[in-house]
């Protein structure tokens, strides 16, 4: 029986580590929103509306992120979870 317990004990997820990782993602996302330009929320909404013209999506499944480097370079990252085709 102790051999089976040995294998079972290694598979338990550490919830504290998982919670910490999720919190770090949320904090990083909120920091990015603070530094975004004033027009960014409207631009994000318009991008979602254009996508919805062609594909039925859930707006919560769309992430738009603007990364700005010190080299005056801006990168607009768009991630859309598309529905599976039937």
Swiss-Prot record:
NCBIfam families: minE, PRK00296.1
Source organism of the structure: Shewanella sediminis (strain HAW-EB3)
Single biological process term from Gene Ontology: regulation of division septum assembly
Keyword match Ribosomal protein: no
Role description: Prevents the cell division inhibition by proteins MinC and MinD at internal division sites while permitting inhibition at polar sites. This ensures cell division at the proper site by restricting the formation of a division septum at the midpoint of the long axis of the cell.
Keyword Amino-acid biosynthesis: no
Keyword field: Cell cycle, Cell division
Family from the record: Belongs to the MinE family.
Phylogenetic lineage: Bacteria, Pseudomonadati, Pseudomonadota, Gammaproteobacteria, Alteromonadales
Official protein name in the record: Cell division topological specificity factor
Domain of life: Bacteria
Gene3D superfamilies, alphabetized: Cell division topological specificity factor MinE
SUPFAM superfamilies: Cell division protein MinE topological specificity domain
């Amino acid at each position: 029986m102790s051999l089976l317990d040995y294998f079972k004990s290694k598979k338990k997820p550490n919830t504290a580590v998982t919670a910490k990782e999720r919190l770090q993602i949320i904090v990083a996302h909120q920091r990015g929103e603070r530094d975004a330009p004033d027009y960014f929320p409207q631009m994000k909404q318009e991008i979602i509306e254009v996508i919805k013209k062609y594909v039925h999506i859930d707006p919560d499944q769309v992430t738009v992120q603007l990364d700005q480097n010190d080299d005056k370079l801006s990168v607009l990252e768009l991630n859309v979870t598309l529905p599976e085709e039937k």
